Amino acid sequence: RAIGVWIALVAALSVFLHGMEVRAATFDITNQCPYTVWAAASPGGGQQLDQGQTWTIQVAAGTTQARIWARTGCSFDGSGRGTCQTGDCNGMLSCQGYGQVPATLAEYALNQYMNLDFYDISLVDGFNVPLSMTPTSTDPNCKGRIACLSDINSQCPSDLKVTGGCKSACARYNTPEYCCTGASENTCGPTDYSKFFKGQCPQAYSYAKDDATSTFTCPSGTNYKVVFCG
């Protein structure tokens, strides 16, 4: 009888855990820009996207420190090796890590604290292409669409401007004040540069400690759409 009870308990636990299991998230990445971009994802790789094209990736639950971005001004050979003006990742079409600055980032971590996904748009690495990030969930606890669609490149401060993009102050000067490192790690605040970026894109991270107005959540198991220029 004890064995029967134990088997019943194990079976019940198995059903419970199966119900808690969170599936991989699907990310549909679409280019609505009037020019070609080379989408990059870590994890995920990379894909050339002409205007109107979509690339779909699957990302495992529990993935952290993940990001999606657009590369511009790229040229790759038949083996997938080449260079990009912005967002380049070690000269590879299929990215195996993070890209070079400047690049507008869609960042996320899946199935974290309280079974939530955390997602944001970041300008901490600067800006190259407008983008939006939209969860598919209709859960009222899900923030919904976030976007950075301003034409920052045309308004970029002259000392941050580079071909095809606009660097952040941290990327340009690499000082504790702008990067929130060293003695400034726990005390740094907005600067004139970060206020410029925040004014252009209020929902995006403008510097490393800009969490309060820039991090959003959805229930785990949500799928997402990332759209460049839309």
From Swiss-Prot:
Belongs to the thaumatin family. The keyword Signal applies. Gene3D superfamilies: Thaumatin (2.60.110.10). Residues 1-24 form the signal peptide. It comes from Cryptomeria japonica (Japanese cedar). Transmembrane segments: none annotated. May be involved in disease resistance. Induction: Weakly induced by arachidonic acid. The keyword Cell membrane does not apply. This is Pathogenesis-related thaumatin-like protein 3.3. Keywords: Allergen, Disulfide bond, Pathogenesis-related protein, Plant defense, Signal, Stress response.
